[in-house]
From Swiss-Prot:
Gene: ACTT6
Note: Gene clusters encoding host-selective toxins (HSTs) are localized on conditionally dispensable chromosomes (CDCs), also called supernumerary chromosomes, where they are present in multiple copies. The CDCs are not essential for saprophytic growth but controls host-selective pathogenicity. Although conventional disruption could not be accomplished due to the high number of the copies identified in the genome, the high sequence identity among these copies is likely an advantage for RNA silencing, because it allows knockdown of all copies of this gene simultaneously.
Knockout consequences: Leads to drastic reduction of ACT-toxin production and disease severity after inoculation on detached leaves.
Signal sequence extent: none
Family indicated by similarity: Belongs to the enoyl-CoA hydratase/isomerase family.
UniProt EC number: 4.2.1.-
Superkingdom field: Eukaryota
InterPro entries for the chain: ClpP/crotonase-like_dom_sf, Enoyl-CoA_hydra/iso, Enoyl-CoA_Hydratase/Isomerase
Coiled coil: none
Upper taxonomic lineage: Eukaryota, Fungi, Dikarya, Ascomycota, Pezizomycotina
Protein name, as recorded: Enoyl-CoA hydratase ACTT6
GO MF annotation terms: lyase activity
Amino acid sequence: MTYFTIKSAAMSPDDDAPSPDINSLGRLMSHSEVESRGNGYEVLQQAGTVRILLSRPERGNALSLSLARDLTRLFQTFSAQHSVHRIVLTGKGKYFCSGMDLGEELYEDATERCLALQDLFGAIDACPKTTIAVINGPAFGGGVGLAFVCDIRVAVSTSFFCLSEVKLGLCPATVSRFIVREWGVSLARMAMLTARKIQPQTLHEMGVLHAVALDEEALEAVTRDVLNDLRFAAPQATAWCKVLTRKTRNANSDHDQLARQIFEAMVVAGSESEYGVAQFRLGNKNICWEQVECRHIG
């Protein structure tokens, strides 16, 4: 899929984060109810789409230790639910996510905190569902990792991405593997060393941001377009695509074996493809997979 900049009412980017009137998720889901709340997040679900809203705007949606653990549990739970096909992650207020919560005690529980963050990013990366980061504002440090560990990323033009840890004597230890994987070594290293703000247009031109919207309204529109496209993606095929792309990054002799295993699994009797090909032969090219019972997703 290729997405292009969607134009709406023009906004002038500012070095500082913009202050949107209301967050995009709230408008996008105005017809839905919040299904659950936690300490720093809200969850909404409609059909096969789950939306997770980071809701600590007074802290820039920073990742506290408890929030990191809660988000990990959410992604693990939704990964195992066959009724869930897509997971949207976005933020409330001015920021998408300002990274690790520096207001907490970092030095007494360093190992515990590191493991919690690794578990979070690992849970998102391994999630068999399609994950979409809807980046409503600036992202710092771990917030950059939170965006780019997701499969699809769309951002408002007034956002930016800053790996600012080096200014504090820190480094983006837990997210570096994902940033290097998605951005490439050269840009990732420069961003880490300089703490420079990386503009969304730069990442869009590289193909690692899949859309840049000029304002909140346009961000909602492009999110709807992405979700509409994903309605026709079979869940097991989606999970396999994600496994293959993860493994291909470190291609070795195991990849060919994995490819054979997946190919053999996807063409057996009772598989998704048996149903999908049969429907195609009947002229149905847009299958609503949410209405199809699947044997296994993972």
